Amino acid sequence: MKTIAITELTEIEAIIRKCPYCTVGITDLEGNPYVVPMNFAYRDGVIYLHSGPEGSKVTMAERHTRVCITFCEGHELVYMHRQVACSYSMKSRSVMCHGNVRFIEDMDEKRNVLDVIMQQYTSDEFKYSEPAVRNVKVWEVKIDKMTCRSFGLRPSEVTSE
């Protein structure tokens, strides 16, 4: 099975938009990896996340702002030879993004980002109460490194390397 790099930004963004959630990798307070699924929105090279105003992941991200965010879609079990276990693979496409977390504090900016996040999941319009906006932590991660791969391709599916 082959793995190929995907470099076309429009294709990478299409993969991101197909994902219902992302996984965020943070460094915990002891220096260990901590990975958590989160709802998100993506716009113009920026990933937006939201969470409660406090808790483990917020404390970690305040201490260690560097994060890795991954997206994966299109899971399909594939094989080259049905009776050969090592020929099996999971066909999928994944995007890996790196950046630093900035917590948005401005109330109007928070509302705008919450709209962007909600647009990821629904076309409905929303209003946000002052207490609700005050009680949410809005994360902004400007992507400074992004890679994308397609895994589990049969040689006949690879058009170029």
Region locations from a protein language model:
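Beta-strand-connecting loop/turn residues
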Residues: 45-46, 65, 144-146
